[in-house]
A protein has these predicted regions:
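Two-component/phosphorelay signaling modules centered on CheY-like receiver
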Residues: 13-31
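Acidic, metal-coordinating helix/loop segments flanking the phosphotransfer/catalytic sites
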Residues: 32-50, 59
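C-terminal output helix
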Residues: 38, 92-93, 107-120
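Short amphipathic alpha-helix used as the core "switch/output" element in two-component signaling
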Residues: 60-79, 97
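The C-terminal output helix
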Residues: 121-135
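AAA+ ATPase active-site-proximal loops
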Residues: 135-146
Length: 146
């Protein structure tokens, strides 16, 4: 089992359940959210190492703009957090927009289990490597003048 907590955000309960069952045997923690409005509170309340984010949340909408909006919000508060976008309505242009927007990867539904797990592992590895090369700077305590 690999270290890491994955947050899955998708409005489809079947997708959430399928991904949770797949990933709970592979990673330390799996969190799910069916409403993207809960993303920020989840990220604020517990550590998350990667987000799997659906691109469409409203019925009849398949532009991917909702997912791109939430990707931007995640980037604002946690720029180092890898986000893998999920969609059933993918095309090259949408994938390019997601990757240019900061997504770590782009996965079409239905996904191949081994391929998805490999993409998650790669994104987690890249994040860990990046943290080793560029550690997060913590503010130093102010010097005391006596």
């Amino acid at each position: 089992m690999q270290a890491g907590t994955i947050l899955i955000v998708d409005d489809n309960k079947s997708v959430l359940t399928s991904l949770e069952l797949l990933l709970e045997d592979e990673f330390e923690g799996v969190e799910t959210a069916s409403n993207p409005n809960s993303i920020l509170s989840v990220l604020d309340s517990r550590p998350v190492d990667l987000v799997l984010l659906d691109m469409n949340f409203s019925a009849g909408v398949n532009t991917g703009n909702e997912g791109l909006f939430w990707l931007r919000r995640i980037r604002e508060i946690a720029p180092e957090l890898p986000v893998i976008m999920l969609t059933a309505y993918g095309d090259v242009e949408l994938a390019v927009r997601a990757l240019k927007g900061g997504a770590a990867d782009f996965v079409l539904k239905p996904w191949d289990n081994d391929n998805l797990i490999g993409k998650i592992r790669a994104a987690l590895h890249e994040r860990k490597s990046s943290q080793l090369v560029h550690p997060v700077e913590r503010p130093s305590e102010p010097a005391m003048i006596i």
